[in-house]
Amino acid sequence: MSNPVSINNSGSISNSNLNNESLSPSRLSSSPNSKSMELNGKRTLKSSVVKTLLNRSSSGNNLNNTVTTRRAAGSFTSNYQNIYTPNNNSYNSSNNNNNNNNDDDTVSVDGDNPPDSPKSTKDHSNSVGSNSGGGGGGSSGGLNMSMNNIKQQQQDNLIKQQQKDRSLWTVRSLKEHAEVLDIMERLKPVNRAISFGQIYAREETQFDFDPLIGRDTMLQLILQHLQFEGLMDSRKLLEEEARVQYPEYAINESRLVTLLRTALKDSERVFQLTLDDKKRDSQQQLEEHLAFLGLFKDETATDIMGEDVNIYDEPENSNIIYVDDKEKEKEKEKEKEKEKDKFGPNSTNSLSGSGSSPNIPSGMNNNSSSIGNNSIGNSNSYSNGELSPLSASTLLMMSPQNKNSIETNKPQVKAASLNKLVILLTPDNNHDLEYTKTFLLTYQSFTTPEMLLEKLVQRYHVPQKPGQSLDDWKKSAVPIQLRVANVIRTWIKDYFSDFNDKLIQNVKSLYENMKQSGNMSHAKILSESLNAKIKGMVGMDDQKRAPTFTSPAPEPKVPKNIWSQTLDIFSVDEEEIARQLTLMDFEIFSAIKSTELLNQSWNKPKLRHRSPNVLTLINRFNEISQWTATSILSYPKVKDRARIMAKFIKIAEYCMRHLNNFNTSMAILSGLNASSVHRLKFTKEELPKHTQQVYTELQFHLSSAQAYKEYRALLAKANPPCLPYLGVYLTDLTFFEEGNPDFIQGFINFGKRKLIYGSISNVQSFQNAKYNLQPVYQITKLLKGFKLLEENDLYSRSMSFEPRNKERSEIL
């Protein structure tokens, strides 16, 4: 066993064994000429300590003092404090009992406290006196056991870490932490975690069959839909396979489609969950910003003033705002000035006759009216100044109906509570038909069908005032009750799609109540109108709407090769193509319901299902525009392109001049003004002079300048039948919706609803007059089956046919 060397406070060596005196740290540090030796000694001592730890940690031989081991961050460290044991020799520094002298008494390999032995460590090595008494062997044996245990524990921990199951860690962690799962599903509902719905869904009840709509009911709905669509063979085949019998019902609609529309209407907010994250986040930020500014309007909110107040508890002379006379006079003067400026005698030119050329503004010849860039689908893109709409009052004054209403001396309602609007809807005298039409068309923008029926029921039950005789009460109540019954009848007749099963039952309860009260005439009004709709009976008014013509339709201009498979657009006369296009487009236009034009449904993804026919006409417009450009760019030679371009110009001219079909004319002009066609300079120069003049006139009269001023003037002069350009109405409706508040001083802005009704009623007036034309199946099929090229392909062809900086002689 080696003899320890003890170093006292004065730095002298107390042991007589000086064989390794030259290696003593105290000697190295005390010698004035030993700086280089000190550095070498530090490196040697430090490396020796590390080697000793690695080579001898398992045996513990020649380690006479306690080794302090620590475990940090998954590893252990052996701290040798004041100990050095190379070559069976140990240098031990004594540890004084006085803690204040510890810093001076401790011998450090580095001349300071070693990194592995901080000053705060309380586990110092023992002094020479305590270790020299033959206890070294026991200490070494204890150290061996301690080191082996630590090593074994470290190996066990390493094995456990390696064997830990890391598969599906996300799923398992979310199961263990439900709050994290809840937050994730709230932030990203597109994950569609079913558990989120299960947490907040109502308690499930197990049924052997569906209590709401079972298999038989579903089959009956499908069979009724097939019956309604005229698919009799499919219906019979389904009956045989399903072994069910379909009792024929006289229902003038598909109940399956009606139920699906109702479901879509009830679940419109669900659409937001299907939006992509970026779009949804931007929409949420916009709504939060608008809410902060106090401008956000929840489309599902129906908290309208007066909904929770009985209609007869409403104060008589309050909660209504009228348009004052001064405001009306000022508005009239402004409109007269605008009429002089915009619709003067020299502002428009007659389209009859092609000899006189219109006064075309400078620059109009070479610049299209940007119709190609402002397609019908983007009708609200007027922020650039080109499509700045006319004022609301100007647009209303263009309609003869609204002109008459403005010129009357009746007080005009500007805003009112819901109760007041219902009272005006059902007056005891002086019934206003235009007000009824406006209200029933637009009421869903400020209340619900259920609330409206509830208010009408309240209005029907006229209370008897204190001291009022029965005869006097009847004189005042009967006219109001009759008006309520007539309003409900009109509502059912014109807007039966507003009624779901619950609402129909409420109407039935109302006329049962009328019967019990002895008002048989009122009950008959409701029962007949409701039964007529349910059973699909056609009323007298619907029969009057059937087209009747006093003269026969003109003879179609059928080409000789009408039955040939080589039939193409060049084989058919331009006039007949214009007729068939008009019939096809007017069929879509006449199918548009007034409700499809409300709330900008065509422009909002989650409401698009409300406007199927509007979207169909928009798509049809864009198809004709694309077809025009594709047809022109299908020919590589200039003369061929000029020939097909001239044909389309003639078709557009005939549609506008002779058929008053402005929608199809605008679609063709949009294709001619597409960037891929508009740049074809040599093709346009190849057109005949007369065709170039017609093209210029088309651009002028259908220009979007000054909110389509020239087009509006043509439309005002046009005699029915007429197919207007739908994009203008969509622009106006967007302007009315976004440019006017829904409420004024907390009351419903009914003036805004009048503007909307005025525009929609104009559309309805054009739907009533049908075209007396004969369809030709072969030509219609040809016009439906054209091929379309994408915008990029069209522009690539345009650049290859007429490259930039090329002369006419270099072009085919």
From Swiss-Prot:
<feature type="compositionally biased region" description="Low complexity">
    <location>
        <begin position="53"/>
        <end position="65"/>
    </location>
</feature>
<feature type="domain" description="N-terminal Ras-GEF">
    <location>
        <begin position="409"/>
        <end position="535"/>
    </location>
</feature>
<keyword id="KW-0344">Guanine-nucleotide releasing factor</keyword>
<feature type="region of interest" description="Disordered">
    <location>
        <begin position="1"/>
        <end position="146"/>
    </location>
</feature>
<dbReference type="InterPro" id="IPR036964">
    <property type="entry name" value="RASGEF_cat_dom_sf"/>
</dbReference>
<feature type="compositionally biased region" description="Polar residues">
    <location>
        <begin position="75"/>
        <end position="86"/>
    </location>
</feature>
<feature type="compositionally biased region" description="Gly residues">
    <location>
        <begin position="131"/>
        <end position="141"/>
    </location>
</feature>
<feature type="region of interest" description="Disordered">
    <location>
        <begin position="320"/>
        <end position="382"/>
    </location>
</feature>
<feature type="compositionally biased region" description="Basic and acidic residues">
    <location>
        <begin position="323"/>
        <end position="343"/>
    </location>
</feature>
<dbReference type="InterPro" id="IPR000651">
    <property type="entry name" value="Ras-like_Gua-exchang_fac_N"/>
</dbReference>
<dbReference type="InterPro" id="IPR006594">
    <property type="entry name" value="LisH"/>
</dbReference>
<dbReference type="InterPro" id="IPR008937">
    <property type="entry name" value="Ras-like_GEF"/>
</dbReference>
<dbReference type="Pfam" id="PF00617">
    <property type="entry name" value="RasGEF"/>
</dbReference>
<dbReference type="GO" id="GO:0007265">
    <property type="term" value="P:Ras protein signal transduction"/>
</dbReference>
<feature type="compositionally biased region" description="Low complexity">
    <location>
        <begin position="344"/>
        <end position="382"/>
    </location>
</feature>
<feature type="domain" description="Ras-GEF">
    <location>
        <begin position="573"/>
        <end position="804"/>
    </location>
</feature>
<comment type="function">
    <text>Promotes the exchange of Ras-bound GDP by GTP.</text>
</comment>
<dbReference type="InterPro" id="IPR023578">
    <property type="entry name" value="Ras_GEF_dom_sf"/>
</dbReference>
<dbReference type="GO" id="GO:0005085">
    <property type="term" value="F:guanyl-nucleotide exchange factor activity"/>
</dbReference>
<feature type="compositionally biased region" description="Low complexity">
    <location>
        <begin position="1"/>
        <end position="36"/>
    </location>
</feature>
<dbReference type="Pfam" id="PF00618">
    <property type="entry name" value="RasGEF_N"/>
</dbReference>
<dbReference type="GO" id="GO:0005886">
    <property type="term" value="C:plasma membrane"/>
</dbReference>
<protein>
    <recommendedName>
        <fullName>Ras guanine nucleotide exchange factor J</fullName>
    </recommendedName>
</protein>
<feature type="domain" description="LisH">
    <location>
        <begin position="214"/>
        <end position="246"/>
    </location>
</feature>
<dbReference type="InterPro" id="IPR001895">
    <property type="entry name" value="RASGEF_cat_dom"/>
</dbReference>
<feature type="compositionally biased region" description="Low complexity">
    <location>
        <begin position="87"/>
        <end position="101"/>
    </location>
</feature>
